[in-house]
Amino acid sequence: MSEGTPNSTHFGYKTVESDQKADMVAGVFHSVAAKYDIMNDVMSFGIHRMWKRFTIESAGARPGMKVLDLAGGTGDLTAKFSHIVGDKGQVTLADINDSMLKVGREKLRDKGIVGNVNYVQANAEALPFPDNHFDIITIAFGLRNVTDKDAAIRSMLRVLKPGGKLLVLEFSKPKHDVMRKVYDLYSFKVMPKMGALITQDAESYEYLAESIRMHPDQETLKGMMVDAGFEQVEYTNMTDGIVALHKGYKF
């Protein structure tokens, strides 16, 4: 999917200046942060938990590892990784949006998840971490909101250790026509109404639906990861391709 001209990009279906998108996306997530977890459960009928569980299982994390949960938001994956890597490991929850980080930090601390988790406000396109630092990086439902996806993927490659794994969990393209039609109807007619009802913000959920449609499809994203330098790149479709999990290694 085209990212626009060199100085422009997509914000949903709109074309905007590249340097404006980050602030516009930030506005969306500042607006929805407090109700983000509730909306995830309502909009996906709870299925997002199954998608995330599969991602955790596919990551193959072990005690003592360093994990980066990028665009980690309210910390669903961080919570699971924290238990897996244990006291000798470390999980970094990074997000560009301070409102999402605040919600995630408070939620995990309320659950008693402290000690091996740290929180960093970071832009995926220029990660503030040393080279060859993490064993595993996950980015769940975040890549589509990044202005320069290619730069972000290269940045993730840089901070992975040799032998490390990147997992990208993201909305993608349904494989069958019937599912595509149902999904479009749900995304553009139902989601904004639920957003208005629960968060009093239909516009943000209109953007989220549009951003999903503008995101690269399964094969395009696979090619982007290969072009960045990842090896053994593959993906698994879930729920008929509504969501796909891409995996790639750094060697």
UniProtKB/Swiss-Prot annotation:
Binding site for S-adenosyl-L-methionine: T74, D95, N123, A124
PROSITE patterns, alphabetized: SAM_MT_UBIE (PS51608), UBIE_1 (PS01183), UBIE_2 (PS01184)
Enzyme class at the top of the EC tree: transferase
Organism of origin: Shewanella woodyi (strain ATCC 51908 / MS32)
Any Pfam family matching the protein: Ubie_methyltran
Function text: Methyltransferase required for the conversion of demethylmenaquinol (DMKH2) to menaquinol (MKH2) and the conversion of 2-polyprenyl-6-methoxy-1,4-benzoquinol (DDMQH2) to 2-polyprenyl-3-methyl-6-methoxy-1,4-benzoquinol (DMQH2).
Reaction(s) this enzyme catalyzes, per UniProt: a 2-demethylmenaquinol + S-adenosyl-L-methionine = a menaquinol + S-adenosyl-L-homocysteine + H(+); a 2-methoxy-6-(all-trans-polyprenyl)benzene-1,4-diol + S-adenosyl-L-methionine = a 5-methoxy-2-methyl-3-(all-trans-polyprenyl)benzene-1,4-diol + S-adenosyl-L-homocysteine + H(+)
EC number, UniProt record: 2.1.1.163, 2.1.1.201
Keyword Metal-binding: no
Pathway(s) where this gene product acts: Quinol/quinone metabolism; menaquinone biosynthesis; menaquinol from 1,4-dihydroxy-2-naphthoate: step 2/2; Cofactor biosynthesis; ubiquinone biosynthesis
GO biological process, one term: menaquinone biosynthetic process
Record key words, sorted: Menaquinone biosynthesis, Methyltransferase, S-adenosyl-L-methionine, Transferase, Ubiquinone biosynthesis
Family annotation (InterPro entries): SAM-dependent_MTases_sf (IPR029063), UbiE/COQ5_MeTrFase (IPR004033), UbiE/COQ5_MeTrFase_CS (IPR023576)
Similarity comment text for this entry: Belongs to the class I-like SAM-binding methyltransferase superfamily. MenG/UbiE family.
GO-annotated molecular function: 2-methoxy-6-polyprenyl-1,4-benzoquinol methyltransferase activity; demethylmenaquinone methyltransferase activity
Gene3D superfamilies listed in its UniProt record: Vaccinia Virus protein VP39
Name the UniProt record assigns to this protein: Ubiquinone/menaquinone biosynthesis C-methyltransferase UbiE
